[in-house]
Amino acid sequence: MESITISKIQNWKKNQIKFAAITAYDFSFSRLFEKEGIPIMLVGDSLGMTIQGHNSTLPVKIQDIKYHTKAVRRGAPNSFLLSDLPFMSYYSIEETLKNTAKIIQSGANMIKIEGGKWLVETVKELSKRSILVCGHIGLTPQSINFLSGYKIQGKEKNDAQRIIDEAFILEEAGIKMLVLECIPSLLAKKITENLSIPVIGIGSGHHTDGQILVMQDLLGITDGKKLKFVKNFLCHNGSIQNAIKQYINEVKNGNFPSEKYSF
């Protein structure tokens, strides 16, 4: 795979080329994902649940993201790599800059932060320093206690308008990519069509520019109740490689997520 850059991803949006992304946490899987053609990987704070066994992302520390970012970058030298800033690691500009430096130096191309209007100054300060920022709105897992659980956001008119406003405000502040999580498909469509930056969806329908899934969900190895937007790509494919190929193809063709996996 040739090196994936933010310019290339922006061109995909411009040319209406859909793309697949996946979470990755270690060398072996990231190497396999890159070999099979996954262009974008996220070292997500979801590792708190999938790797560390917690019941939320809240216990994850910046050291954890740093460690896993290094491992993923070794396995996937050419993929575009996002890394989360975990809970309370960006509560001040000074703390954000310090922690962002650690993650970028570990191999990430871009950092991802959760939240809306309150992040405007943070995004501006990072952008001034030529640091690529991905926003994350809708269901924000770091706010799980405030949101009273993992549930769809933006169903009510006022909440939908708030999410739309946040998307535009964050783009104006300088984010270069946006993740929409667990919002209605038509709301995600409206946001995607009206932003100039690439929009990646998870549980937000098929109208976004790209899709992302947690690797354990995609491979059907997550315990507990299966989320509506999760599809097991491994069960009928016989190998992880074939599962990844099917995922990429279904996203590119606009077949995933179908209505069955959307809100």
Curated annotation (Swiss-Prot):
InterPro entries noted in UniProt: Pantoate_hydroxy_MeTrfase (IPR003700), Pyrv/PenolPyrv_kinase-like_dom (IPR015813), Pyrv_kinase-like_dom_sf (IPR040442)
Record key words, sorted: Cytoplasm, Magnesium, Metal-binding, Pantothenate biosynthesis, Transferase
Record-stated family: Belongs to the PanB family.
EC number(s) per entry: 2.1.2.11
Biological function: Catalyzes the reversible reaction in which hydroxymethyl group from 5,10-methylenetetrahydrofolate is transferred onto alpha-ketoisovalerate to form ketopantoate.
Residues bound to 3-methyl-2-oxobutanoate: D45, S46, D84, K112
The protein's annotated pathway: Cofactor biosynthesis; (R)-pantothenate biosynthesis; (R)-pantoate from 3-methyl-2-oxobutanoate: step 1/2
Family matches, as CDD domains: KPHMT-like
Name used for this protein in its record: 3-methyl-2-oxobutanoate hydroxymethyltransferase
Reactions catalysed, as given in the entry: 3-methyl-2-oxobutanoate + (6R)-5,10-methylene-5,6,7,8-tetrahydrofolate + H2O = 2-dehydropantoate + (6S)-5,6,7,8-tetrahydrofolate
The protein's assembly and partners: Homodecamer; pentamer of dimers.
GO molecular function: 3-methyl-2-oxobutanoate hydroxymethyltransferase activity; magnesium ion binding
Record's keyword annotation contains Metal-binding: yes
PANTHER family hit by this protein: 3-METHYL-2-OXOBUTANOATE HYDROXYMETHYLTRANSFERASE
Domain of life: Bacteria
GO cellular component: cytoplasm
Keyword Metal-binding included in the entry's annotation: yes
Biological processes annotated in GO: pantothenate biosynthetic process
Cofactor note: Binds 1 Mg(2+) ion per subunit.
Entry annotation: catalytic residues: E181 (proton acceptor)
Cofactor(s) it depends on: Mg(2+)
